[in-house]
């Protein structure tokens, strides 16, 4: 006997509410990325930067697999953005996990091409940082969804715990790799060239918006962790071709530095190929 049970469709209010959450999430993520790059350009001490951003939570737990995955993902994302432009990091680190999702990626191909054009020098550290960040955040999302099943803390408190656990993990590394003395010297030598007050505001804004955009991303807990990401992803084949084009261009540029005309011709031949992706 065939069951006559019909699936329950979400109401218009629920759909609009989820859409608002996603819009806020993406907006906060964009603001965070901009401030993050400003801070790294003015004060290139990535370990202090990521430590400060993780300090925007509440300390409630000590050790957790999800916190470790979150820490690795955040560290590698900051490492990648310190080496390459923001668009290249996000193009590389956001690969589509569902083949059928590529049908909705037409608007993302342009992003892929833009990232390749903007990042003219291929940087393996930046690329690998984005790849490791992507993998770590996948595990973080899976562990997080499992941790939210059954009787659990609220999503707001859950992410507060996650942030501070990551802070405990990353602080010893920040002190050993850079340390307070290096931060103080760097602040005097690097930031003194610009407005220190403005740079301080950038650091605060970067830390706050990092916490806000991640906190909002945890609110729609009813959804699978793949669903909020289609607009942030790019087709895997398109990303691979764009990254390959960036690498080829950087090699050509290094070989023809003394011949400006040949460099322009090579760029003209490469750019249409990348844009057509």
From Swiss-Prot:
Entry's Gene Ontology cellular component terms: membrane
Keyword Glycosyltransferase tagged: no
Keyword Transport listed: yes
InterPro entries: Sugar_P_trans_dom, TPT_transporter
Top-level taxon in the UniProt lineage: Eukaryota
Membrane topology summary: Multi-pass membrane protein
Segments traversing the membrane: 8-28, 46-66, 124-143, 153-173, 230-250
Family as reported in the entry's similarity comment: Belongs to the TPT transporter family. GPT (TC 2.A.7.9) subfamily.
Protein name as catalogued: Putative glucose-6-phosphate/phosphate-translocator-like protein 1
Source species of the chain: Arabidopsis thaliana
